[in-house]
A protein has these predicted regions:
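Extracytoplasmic/secretory soluble proteins
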Residues: 1-281
Length: 281
């Protein structure tokens, strides 16, 4: 009604998914991944097991993919770096934090059995074995009591100080500023490695935002100029708007290279590596 071109730029799978019982769609997400997006192989994971690079190298780049090795390495860290907490993790909140579906994804725990029926991931044998391993690590003093009660701000500060030798991180993108701040202060950094893994050969099934998206946007009935708002939606969803919100302004933050692809300008790349908060702004 207000901008027919909108229907040409929206992702039809996402648009239809948002339709209500009356068949109409009233909102659209700012970030949505469809089945085709996942199958393209271009969707980065957002959950990682990370370790301080200096610790990793000092210990000879150890393997922590099995329960036995994991427990042994945590003890080695405790003995070699008594000032650090061997393992930390993103905030638990009201649930189990990264120790529920995130850990299950690392272990490749299926959602359904071979017959297509519901599979209770919480009772998976390998998952329970890893939970016991984490409990043993905790009882050995290699996971702090504070990790279960720290709020987001407290956890962030500990990451900036490099207090944790290793971490199970749910939502790595949200830690970019903290990782950069630590790197600036310390001369080392956190790196992602293969963490807890399946002992039976299952591949990890790390997840990302699905078709429902992240934040949903709506045009209210009280909008004074719904046509203008719809046109803004169209622009932001279309390629020019996507480039603007991702890369900024041509000649100011990015330029096209000889292959016709977008490259950040050198000063922007440097800002990303040295001041993540300023880069995000």
């Amino acid at each position: 009604k207000y901008d027919p071109y909108l229907m040409k730029v929206v992702n039809q799978d996402t648009f239809k998914w948002y339709a209500l019982e009356d068949g109409k769609t009233y909102g659209y997400p700012n970030y949505s991944n469809t089945k085709a997006d996942y199958e393209s192989g271009n969707i980065p994971v957002n959950d990682n097991f990370v370790i301080r690079e200096d610790v990793y190298n000092a210990l000879g780049k150890p393997d922590v993919s099995t329960p036995e090795n994991f427990e042994k390495v945590m003890q080695q860290i405790k003995e070699k770096y008594p000032e650090m907490t061997p393992m930390g993790f993103t905030t638990v909140g009201d649930g189990a934090g990264p120790f529920l579906d995130k850990l299950q994804d690392f272990l490749g725990v299926p959602l359904e059995d071979k017959n297509g029926k519901y599979y209770d991931r919480n009772l998976d044998k390998e998952y329970l074995e890893w939970l016991k391993t984490f409990n043993d690590v905790y009882r050995a003093g290699n996971i702090s009591d504070d990790s279960f009660t720290d709020d987001g701000a407290t956890f962030d500060e500990k990451v900036k100080q490099g207090n944790y030798a290793t971490m199970l991180v749910a939502g790595t993108s949200g830690q970019g500023g903290n990782f950069t701040e630590f790197m600036k202060k310390s001369g080392t950094r956190y790196i992602a490695i293969d963490g807890p893994s399946s002992t039976s050969g299952r591949k990890p099934t790390l997840n990302q935002t699905g078709i429902s998206g992240w934040l949903s946007n709506y045009i209210t009935k009280d909008a004074k100029d719904p046509a203008k708002v719809t046109q803004l939606f169209t622009y932001l969803i279309d390629e020019p708007g996507q480039i603007l919100t991702k890369y900024g302004v041509e000649g100011v933050t990015y330029a096209y290279n000889d292959q016709g692809k977008i490259d950040y300008l050198p000063e922007v790349k440097k800002l990303e590596q040295t001041d993540n908060d300023a880069y995000n702004k």
